[in-house]
Design a protein with these regions (language model features):
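Bacterial Sec-dependent N-terminal signal peptides
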Residues: 1-38
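Conserved, structured core segments of small domains
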Residues: 36-167
Length: 167
């Protein structure tokens, strides 16, 4: 199919159709866009958070499951959960725990997660065993070494800024 060339275009040395021009511009803008360095890499921050060249580090991931203690009274559970929450705060304040939170009701008996700021199961066992609810077998812990973003180390700092203080 021949494209229509207008009379005034015949006398020019170079003619480019709109389709060709659009294609060339599209390719050109993409080459420029993809060649831009958009990295916000902050080596000092990566080092401070313990991150490697990918911004990642080793943690220990913990799933808390329903434990074997089925005889604790409501009052005992209340005291154990108060101790559980106090221990979470203590470990977070010491930067030994970077993420903690409960699971919603599920059929796997998963109750919550911890992500410990340590690199070995042995270190994490000591930390999780400092929890009164784990000691009383309300929870049991399943631990595994995990590789994740070093940015998790900033979770507490940010959480403190977005959670309202208790009255």
């Amino acid at each position: 199919m021949k494209s229509k060339i207008h009379e005034h275009q015949k006398n020019t040395k170079f003619y480019v159709s709109k389709k060709t021009l659009f294609t060339l511009l599209f390719i050109g803008f993409n080459l420029v866009g993809f060649s831009q360095d958009t990295s916000n890499y902050d080596e000092a921050l990566a080092k401070k958070l313990g991150g490697d060249e990918r911004g990642m580090k080793t943690y220990v991931f913990c799933i808390l499951k329903t434990g074997t203690n089925t005889t604790a009274t409501a009052e005992e559970k209340k005291v154990l959960f108060e101790g559980h929450m106090t221990n979470i705060k203590k470990l977070a304040d010491e930067n030994k725990l970077v993420v903690a939170g409960p699971f919603m009701k599920n059929d796997k008996n998963y109750r919550g997660i911890f992500i410990f700021n340590c690199t070995t199961i042995e270190e994490a066992e000591k930390l999780v065993n400092s929890d009164p609810a784990v000691q009383a077998k309300i929870f049991e812990a399943d631990l595994t070494v995990w590789y994740g973003s070093a940015a998790l180390g900033t979770t507490k700092e940010i959480h403190d800024k977005i959670s309202k203080p208790k009255k």
